[in-house]
Amino acid sequence: MAGETNEDVKAMSFEQALDALEKIVDDLERGDVPLDQSIRIYERGEALKAHCDRLLKAAEDKVEKIRLSRDGKPVGTEPLDAD
């Protein structure tokens, strides 16, 4: 984590951010990280989680449902109602 700031999180893809978050969780669960470093990586984890949440929300907003005709052929799309 040395040299990394939370600003670089914004440039990460969802997969990169999720991988980094999973590593942080593993490190914290092992419990062999010094307290000051635990606090720093926890804060980074919060930034990674927020970034992943934003990217997921953006992806959900783009998902569309395919409309089918009576004979089952695709005729267009409409926004997906996730509720």
From Swiss-Prot:
Subunit structure: Heterooligomer composed of large and small subunits.
Family matches, as InterPro entries: Exonuc_VII_S, Exonuc_VII_ssu_sf
SUPFAM superfamilies: XseB-like
Coiled-coil parts of chain: none
Keywords: Cytoplasm, Exonuclease, Hydrolase, Nuclease
EC number, as in UniProt: 3.1.11.6
Organism taxonomic ancestry: Bacteria, Pseudomonadati, Pseudomonadota, Alphaproteobacteria, Hyphomicrobiales
Organism of this sequence: Mesorhizobium japonicum (strain LMG 29417 / CECT 9101 / MAFF 303099)
Name used for this protein in its record: Exodeoxyribonuclease 7 small subunit
